[in-house]
C-alpha cells in the first residue's frame, strides 16, 4: 500500500487469484508474438537471439495453439524497434537504485542496530576492504548511483518518461490494443551463460525487459531445455492484468506437463 505505483490500483481487483489458475486457461485467448527485432541495436529483443531457445519457443507456441489459443504472429511493437538510448535507462537505474538502496539500508540498520545505513557507507566499506570485496569487479555503478540528485531531479524525470513511453504507449499497450490481444508471448531469455571473469557476461537478450521498463506484470513458464539448461516463455500484459496472465500461464503449464529439475552441469562443455 505504501508503493506509489499502486496509487491508481483498480478497486475491483481480485483478492484471491487461485481461481484463475485453470488447466484450460488458454482456450479462447488471443496471444500476440512480437516480430523479432530487425536489428541487434533494437531497444527490446523478444526472440531471435539464440537458435536453440527459438526452437523450443516455437514448439511452445504450437502447443498454445493446440490448447485453444489464437496465436497472432509478427505483432508490431513500435517502441521495441527504436535505437536504444542506454543512457536514459542507466540514468533511471542509478537514480532509483540510490533512492531505494538508501531507504532499505537505513531501515535494515535501524531494525538490526548494526550495518551500513546508506549506499555511501557500502562504497566506503568496499573501498576499505578492496582486497576481498573488489577482487573480481569494481563498483563504478554504485559510485555513479550515489552521485545522483534524487527522484525530483529534472533529468531523471525526463529520462524515465522517455523510457516509459517506449515500453507502454508505444510498446505493450500499442500491441495489445491494436491486435485485440490478451497478452504477448516472448522468449524469456537465452539459456544461462558461464561466468567469465576475463570477458564478462555473454548476455544475448531478454524478452521480458519491456515489461520491466513499463512497470507492467509478466510471468514466465518453463517450456523446455537447451543443452540441459532451462528455457522459458514469458507472458506480458497491460497494467493490473495479473489475473489474465496467471490464467494463461496455468493453461500453458498444464498443457506442457513438464517437470524440469535444476541440476549442476558436470562441465561447461555441454552436449
Language-model segments: residues:
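Acidic-enriched catalytic cores of C-N bond-cleaving enzymes acting on peptides and small amides
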Residues: 1-15, 43-82, 91-126
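Small-aliphatic-rich amphipathic alpha-helix that forms the alpha element of a beta-alpha
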Residues: 170-174, 197-222
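Flexible loop/turn segments at secondary-structure boundaries
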Residues: 39-42, 79-83, 192-195, 227-229, ...
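Short, well-ordered beta-strand elements
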Residues: 221, 229-238, 246-247
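Short helix-loop capping/hinge segments that flank enzyme active sites or metal/cofactor-binding pockets
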Residues: 20, 25-43, 92-168, 173, ...
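Short, surface-exposed loop/helix-turn segments at secondary-structure junctions
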Residues: 11, 45, 157-158, 179, ...
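A short helix-breaking turn/cap at a secondary-structure junction
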Residues: 1-55, 128, 254-271
